[in-house]
A protein has these predicted regions:
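Carbohydrate-binding surfaces of carbohydrate-active enzymes
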Residues: 1-215
Length: 215
């Protein structure tokens, strides 16, 4: 977050969550979210106040049943010692001082998310609930690989353009609050009212028949 227009990042994150949910059409687990920043971008930006809760709730809204972290505590060495963590280096040089740790903004942000998740769990109206989108966008990894590996008139940014094209189709539904499944060519498309299949450089066996039957 905060490395570009946050709206564009939010759209990409929403589609990524929908990809995970659509794999089995079930809820998924968000495993490695950072509570503060990463350590692999050109400039590692700390999440602004309220951003951790907002991004965590976005994952829940798109079907996650958890908000888990990488990492719990920053290490003393190795390549991820400055990657974001629930517990910072603060208070870890000697005997562990919980009072110092809990006074960091990042720790309080994590506490806030935990409190909201406990409230949601107590109500029992969010965890495990499912959405049934009427719109599907076909995103096929093998099609992406084939497109990226092909040599032809245009060989620049093929992989990025595929993702950009998917996002350009996804964005209007996101803006309108319309739920979308992201399916591959092996998936069942018969139950949708609208199927969007951009940049089909490659057809898997049987997909043409599915599309003809759909229309």
């Amino acid at each position: 977050w905060h490395t570009a227009d946050n709206t564009e990042i939010a759209v990409f994150s929403a589609m990524a969550h929908d990809v995970m949910r659509s794999v089995k059409h079930e809820n998924f687990l968000l495993m490695e979210s950072t509570p503060s920043m990463t350590n692999w971008t050109p400039v590692s930006m700390l999440k602004r106040p309220g951003m951790h809760l907002l991004s965590s709730m976005q994952a829940m809204a798109h079907g996650s049943n958890s908000v888990q972290y990488f990492q719990f505590r920053k290490s003393r060495g190795s390549c991820e010692k400055f990657h974001g963590a629930v517990v910072d280096h603060v208070g870890n040089s000697g005997p562990y001082d919980f009072a110092k740790t809990e006074n960091t903004r990042v720790f309080r942000d994590v506490q806030q998310v935990g409190a909201v998740l406990r409230e949601m769990n107590a109500r029992g109206d969010v965890y495990g609930t499912a959405v049934k989108p009427q719109v599907a966008i076909v995103y096929d990894v093998e099609n992406r690989w084939a497109l990226d590996a092909a040599a032809g008139p245009r060989n620049k940014d093929k992989d990025e353009k595929y993702v950009e094209t998917l996002l350009s189709h996804y964005r209007p539904f996101w803006d309108a609050g319309v739920q979308v499944d992201i399916v591959d060519m092996d998936g069942d498309i018969s139950g949708y009212k609208l199927v969007i299949a951009p940049m089909l450089y490659m057809y898997r066996a049987g997909f043409e028949q599915k599309m003809r039957a759909f229309v």
